[in-house]
Amino acid sequence: MIKEVIVVEGRDDITAVKRAVDAEMIAVGGFGINSKIISKIKEAQKRRGVIVLTDPDFAGEKIRSIISKRVKGIKHARISQSEGTKNGDIGVENASPESIIRALNNAKCETQKKTYEFTIEDMLFFKLVGNSEAKKRRDLVGNELGIGYSNGAQFLSRLNNFGISKEELINAVNTVNRRYYDEGI
């Protein structure tokens, strides 16, 4: 049983998550998110904590952002686009139970105070920008860290906002390098 309440977009997502874990859930109804639902999420955050698990697409990130701005201290769980895609449809409802469990286990909380641990130079060094493989590497490393895929600037911001340490990034990059590129740092 997961202690936190899991916030998802819709009923199909609830079904998929229930196949993976035993947890209380709140469905926001996509962009139908309103003050009543936000109040429910705030109450859940006070009582047990909240993990937001939205679709790995623009709409999912927008919903995640709306919730994050209104409810402080929530955790973010993410599945990759490849894990959430089936027959051209992207969503949590398409993810395997294993992918959902991995995402929930890797859920990260945004830090209240932004750190400046990482710079663009780190992104270049780890080939996360300025490289023909950068987009793929950000997807793989982001998945490994549990912060999801994003463009270079947003990825740098997530590294700093989620309190990722240099050691965590190095371990994730090494895992990706060994798994997909047959090399290490």
From Swiss-Prot:
Biological process, per Gene Ontology: rRNA processing
Catalytic activity: Endonucleolytic cleavage of RNA, removing 21 and 42 nucleotides, respectively, from the 5'- and 3'-termini of a 5S-rRNA precursor
Cofactor dependency: Mg(2+)
InterPro entries per record: RNase_M5, RNase_M5_C, TOPRIM_dom, TOPRIM_RNase_M5-like
Entry EC number(s): 3.1.26.8
Binding-site residues, Mg(2+) 2: 55, 57
Function: Required for correct processing of both the 5' and 3' ends of 5S rRNA precursor. Cleaves both sides of a double-stranded region yielding mature 5S rRNA in one step.
Name of this chain's protein: Ribonuclease M5
Organism field: Clostridium acetobutylicum (strain ATCC 824 / DSM 792 / JCM 1419 / IAM 19013 / LMG 5710 / NBRC 13948 / NRRL B-527 / VKM B-1787 / 2291 / W)
Name of the gene this protein is made from: rnmV
